């Protein structure tokens, strides 16, 4: 029983970390969009290299 509880706690922790990482990524993307000088920058592919969050 204790092992199952430990596994559930670890899983919950990992899911929480994953959600927080995605939220940080989305916040960075939003900020990057706000910081763009013009729509032309978007079409030049200047948003993020490889379209990924670091």
Swiss-Prot record:
Tagged with keyword Nucleus: no
Origin superkingdom: Eukaryota
Alphabetically ordered keywords of this record: Amidation, Disulfide bond, Hormone, Neuropeptide, Secreted
Subcellular compartments: Secreted
Alphabetical GO biological process terms: neuropeptide signaling pathway
One annotated GO molecular function: hormone activity
Modified residues (Leucine amide): 36
Signal peptide bounds: none
Disulfide linkage: 25-53
Pfam families associated with the record: ELH
One term under GO cellular component: extracellular region
Family stated for the protein in its record: Belongs to the molluscan ELH family.
Extra remark beyond the main annotation: Califin B probably derives from polyprotein B, which is also the precursor for peptide B.
Physiological role: Injected in sexually mature animals califin B excites LB and LC cells of the abdominal ganglion and cause egg-laying.
Subunit structure: This protein consists of a large 36-residue subunit, bound by a single disulfide-bond to a small 18-residue subunit.
Protein name: Califin-B
Organism: Aplysia californica (California sea hare)
């Amino acid at each position: 029983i204790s092992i199952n509880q430990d596994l559930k706690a670890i899983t919950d922790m990992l899911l929480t970390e994953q959600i927080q990482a995605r939220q940080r990524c989305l916040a960075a993307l939003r900020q990057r969009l706000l910081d763009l000088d013009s729509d032309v920058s978007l079409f030049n592919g200047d948003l993020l290299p490889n379209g990924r969050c670091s």
